[in-house]
């Protein structure tokens, strides 16, 4: 059995640190991609009293949130109109990505005789989603004047927040400042938000009315310097498994597909029942590390869909079947932390955690 153990205390402490850091700004907690792999229902249930909004990528994720919490939920992604009636009935906040969305939403709202809560996404430079910057003001004005829309928010997204010195950060902030000025001229109550986790840590004056700290809430810090208070934020989860078999190699034998790992006579290998079929990175095969009884052991051979092997050497520490194996550590400096694994596989912590799938049990402790 593979378990992602999540510390409720660490999670809540992370959010409290963030809330203190952002001052009076509201907090919108992104729980998209199954709460970055941590389990959307468990995370929402244990944080709903600490945050103002939740945010997700699509309608189906939003319904999972509204099933367990009453907080407002913002959907970042495009509007899937096959789900729009349920979204409106549950007061889920939609993101207007184009001027044309307004008329479509108005028509449906009229038919349902119920207003739609909306946030307008403005493309200030990431060039992925959102209303074109040059069309921003007329779109905001149109939505604000609509009888069937409640324009609750206007937002954008930083493209280079992980690099605090990137000039695009200033360019996007300046553009958003002009949007905020126009928006507040219509109503001071419209929530303006731009910053993700690394945005408000790396840039000044960027919190506006609300921030959206996703990866930071789960305990992952940027690589640039942050102050002492933020350094108290810790990863919330550890991925654990068990040793299910010990194998002793004979002279000339190997292990795994293609037998790329060749051991020595008498070498012992531990079999762990987790693989890339669980969303664990296949690239770690033959070069990753696991922790068994506070000793680091190297992976041996290719990772399979459902299992991997580690070399115990001569097994001087007497690893046994049933011993706990730590695959992902909550200590960033460890060789098997999400940070270290991401570096080793040329990716980011988001990727390592969010790809862990539902074959892995989530457990709040």
From Swiss-Prot:
GO terms, molecular function: alanine racemase activity; pyridoxal phosphate binding
Gene3D superfamilies per the UniProt record, alphabetical: Alanine racemase, Lyase, Ornithine Decarboxylase, Chain A, domain 1
Single GO BP term: D-alanine biosynthetic process
Keywords: Isomerase, Pyridoxal phosphate
Domain of life assignment: Bacteria
Enzymatic reactions: L-alanine = D-alanine
Record InterPro entries: Ala_racemase, Ala_racemase/Decarboxylase_C, Ala_racemase_C, Ala_racemase_N, PLP-binding_barrel
Active site (record annotation): 32 (proton acceptor), 257 (proton acceptor)
Summary of the function given for this chain in its UniProt record: Catalyzes the interconversion of L-alanine and D-alanine. May also act on other amino acids.
Family of this protein: Belongs to the alanine racemase family.
Protein name: Alanine racemase
